[in-house]
């Protein structure tokens, strides 16, 4: 009940912001972005918080409203929170600085068919790393030497056939596990992750 109460409260507050934009006359020249940095397990997988790499915690909403944004399109594609900045620059007609490594979501918004990321990655402290290609997700767990928490294991999920991530295929789908582990290793090397050789 508390969780649904939070949703209702948030919905009301977002409504107040949108109404204030309407009253101010600025609604038509304001970009509104609704997103989150994480979800909550709320009991799924026996977890309550956000400290995991399952879809209920890492797959977050992203709704954009404003001039130049198609109002009738929903897109199911891999993206990163970092992609919001160059997207807003494009929509506002501002040049994206060369130092920005993320990608604009505008091609996805316009066609709904573009692919910006073949894979996305995430991490939690020194105990979890994740790579996902949209269908297959590999989660690698580590034992933290500092806090002496965590465990060493790998999970692999086929999100197309198991969206709730209940059937670990890491020992039955070795080809996908090896492919994704290689991609994860390359990403960890690129970002200088100290757990690469752990």
Segments the model singles out, each with a brief description of its role:
Residues 19-70, 80, 129:
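Histidine-centered active-site microenvironments of extracellular/periplasmic hydrolases
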Residues 44, 64, 107, 132-133, ...:
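Conserved hydrophobic "DFG−1" position in protein kinase catalytic cores
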Residues 55-57, 122-171, 176-179, 198:
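C-terminal, low-complexity/hydrophilic appendages and adjacent surface loops
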Residues 3-6, 10, 80, 84, ...:
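Long, internal low-complexity/basic segments
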Residues 1-30:
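A long, amphipathic alpha-helix that forms part
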Residues 41, 53, 62, 74, ...:
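Conserved beta-strand positions that form and line the central face of beta-propeller blades
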Residues 27-30, 68, 72-131, 178-182, ...:
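Polar, surface-exposed loop/tail segments
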């Amino acid at each position: 009940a508390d969780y649904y109460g939070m949703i209702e409260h948030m919905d009301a507050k977002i409504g107040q912001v949108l109404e204030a934009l309407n009253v101010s006359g600025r609604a038509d020249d304001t970009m509104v972005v609704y997103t989150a940095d994480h979800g909550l397990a709320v009991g799924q997988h026996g977890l309550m918080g956000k400290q995991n790499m399952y879809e209920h915690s890492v797959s977050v909403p992203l709704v954009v409203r404003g001039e130049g944004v198609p109002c009738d399109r929903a897109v199911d594609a891999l993206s990163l929170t970092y992609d919001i900045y160059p997207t807003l620059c494009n929509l506002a007609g501002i040049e994206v600085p060369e130092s920005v490594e993320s990608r604009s979501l505008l091609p996805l918004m316009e066609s709904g068919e573009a692919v910006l990321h073949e894979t996305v990655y995430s991490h939690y402290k020194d105990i979890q790393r994740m790579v996902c290609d949209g269908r297959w997700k590999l989660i690698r767990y580590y034992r933290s030497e500092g806090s002496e928490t965590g465990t060493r294991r790998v999970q692999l999920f086929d999100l197309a056939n198991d969206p709730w991530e209940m059937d670990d295929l890491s020992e039955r789908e070795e080809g996908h596990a090896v492919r994704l582990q290689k991609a994860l290793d390359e990403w960890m090397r690129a970002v200088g992750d100290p757990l690469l050789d752990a």
